């Protein structure tokens, strides 16, 4: 990968049902990082898509009375439409039923066969259709007369069939060595510890084909076998870069991937199986896997099977997309589970967006319109209050790149919204409305610094609330190519003589 390039992915979503808040959460996280990197002058490739093979899809299609591909065409379109409704900035949307993906999977399979890492044997063990995952005997318990996975709580069934196996056991020490040399491969650190403990407990060879289903990519020269959905699905991160065409610019520019954003429930596949497949194929693993927590309704994970889903589209229609994006990013701590509710959403909109940032923008723009004819000119005479605000802002912004590079999104947002709070306080303390008659120069300095603060805050919030941010930056008449993070290196955003346009209300308070 070239320097200052950034390849970020969401998990590709399993379209066995309608999208829910968990899908929205993963996608928005990835979009925020992608937008932030673009604002920091990185060349970004942002991928999302749908994972369309496997037994669960086959059964869902049968239930709907459709052929699997027809079913996938319908549901995948819903997920693709969701990217627009979530205001995602993805560069590609991949489907695992596309020819480019089949080509990549077949090539990777052949490499693993030739390297001796895949062999034919017989599988006997527990399998979860819901998880599309195999489980060991020690990972199974009986509950209410049914066998379930201790990992996910999903029901499992006993399976016996001929199967190709990947020699995962041969990669145990090599994976542990890889984790040791790449200490930030898995974040947060709690997830890293989980993975290391799992690998240290002993790895068994992994079944990577099925003969008991028909919907999937056929094993080359063994068409009675279908490639295991996870080996198939994970390869999407390569196929979007036209692998195996490794001499093309797209692949050379963006592999290895900078960041896989995933839910913690699929961490094992991304942090154990995926790097093992890649290392066996002599392909560099991704730089980072970030396993975020679950979005909870009360104390339970939101999922289709539990019927406790909050519909993101309903919330967008009722509250707005910027509002939902901000709330999800602010509410859920770094890598932890987060419980959401409409009440806490409304409180967040009121406290942070309407009363804080929105109020700051509105009061400054309105005052300049009514008292300065939308023009403000600063002088070099800074007051102690001006210097104090500038210093406090610099202290809050100096670690923002690091926070984002370590996926500390909620810490990032707390710092940014605190800058808005401090700027509101500065205006309250300095009272520019009292200076119009006797000290116009000081009034102008206060207003100009306030505009500079608003510009910085809006650029920093742009990855999270891009629609509102654009309205403010448009009204500040800041050129598109100047809406970047160069001010973190000491550059000004607002010219010494600022001309602004009118600004409508950004966020309405919810009563």
Model region roles, listed by residue range:
Residues 1-5, 19, 45, 49, ...:
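Basic, alpha-helical terminal appendages of large translation-related enzymes
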Residues 1-48, 100-104, 148-370, 412-416:
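Structured secondary-structure scaffolds
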Residues 50-56:
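Short, charge-patterned binding micro-sites
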Residues 60-73:
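A charged helix-plus-loop insertion that forms the helical arch/lid used to bind
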Residues 75-91:
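A glycine-rich helix N-cap at a beta->alpha junction
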Residues 97-117, 127-128:
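Feature captures the FAD/FMN-dependent oxidoreductase FAD-binding
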Residues 129-130, 151:
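Short, cysteine/histidine-rich loop/knuckle motifs that typically chelate Zn2+
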Residues 267, 328-331, 335, 341, ...:
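Active-site-proximal binding-pocket segments
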